[in-house]
């Protein structure tokens, strides 16, 4: 395998996604035209553009539109090769480059990004608080909010089927901190695509939530 690269300019042609024009993340390959994209970019293109390759408009069959084939050769190279962030110059494995952007201050300054607080609605009151932070159940990555946790797990661990405790469920009042789920990544995607805090007060238990819902429905019916 080639030795570690010194800067991102040497790898842009092979490891850049044609859609987002950034380093590939969870690379997938079309089966007919063999073009490679970030999995997320490809799935978004399928939802908006139909059954065509986002680059050449070649045909994409039904099965790969919902379950694209991972470009394991590209993924392996990215796990072996290193490069420098084009914004801050920090060296790392290419596989982790796009994840690095989430914490790269210069990248966030370039695109005008900044951390946001979440507003929690509790009856007629609303308060500002910091989003809860989670640790990835499959690796040492930590200090992730819910959205970042899902993105990290889908980008780094999507094809791993591991029985683990869900880190989000474990923090909820009605959750069981020792109950495991057979495929924690599939569970996260099925149960945690939205943030409970945006719809309810997570500091009260499930029975109290039910009573509030009944009371509110009674007010509406009157």
Curated annotation (Swiss-Prot):
ZnF locations on chain (C2HC RNF-type): 85-104
Pfam family, one: zf-C3HC4_2
Compartments (UniProt record): Chromosome
Residues the entry annotates as binding Zn(2+): 85, 88, 100, 104
Gene Ontology cellular component terms for the protein in this record: nucleus; site of double-strand break
Keyword Transcription in annotation: no
Effect of substituting residue 53 to A: Prevents ubiquitination and auto-ubiquitination
Subunit structure: Interacts with nlk.2 (via C-terminus) and ube2k.
Protein name per its UniProtKB record: E3 ubiquitin-protein ligase RNF138
């Amino acid at each position: 395998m080639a030795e570690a690269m010194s800067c991102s300019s040497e790898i842009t042609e092979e490891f850049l996604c044609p859609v987002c024009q950034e380093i590939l993340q969870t690379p997938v390959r079309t089966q007919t035209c063999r073009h490679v994209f970030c999995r997320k970019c490809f799935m978004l293109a399928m939802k908006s553009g139909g059954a065509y390759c986002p680059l050449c408009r070649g045909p994409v069959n039904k099965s790969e539109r919902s379950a694209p084939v991972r470009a394991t050769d590209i993924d392996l190279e990215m796990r072996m090769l290193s490069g420098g962030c084009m914004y801050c110059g920090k060296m790392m494995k290419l596989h982790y480059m796009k994840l690095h952007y989430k914490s790269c201050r210069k990248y966030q300054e370039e695109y005008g990004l900044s951390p946001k607080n979440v507003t929690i609605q509790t009856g007629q009151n609303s308060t500002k608080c910091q989003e809860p932070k989670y640790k990835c159940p499959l690796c040492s990555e930590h200090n992730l909010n819910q959205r970042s946790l899902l993105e990290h797990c889908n980008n780094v661990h999507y094809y791993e089927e591991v029985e683990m405790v869900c880190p989000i469920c474990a923090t909820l009042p009605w959750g069981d901190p020792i109950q495991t789920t057979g495929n924690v990544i599939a569970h996260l995607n099925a149960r945690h695509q939205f943030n409970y805090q945006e719809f309810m007060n997570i500091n009260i238990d499930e029975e109290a939530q039910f009573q509030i819902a009944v009371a509110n429905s009674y007010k509406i019916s009157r």
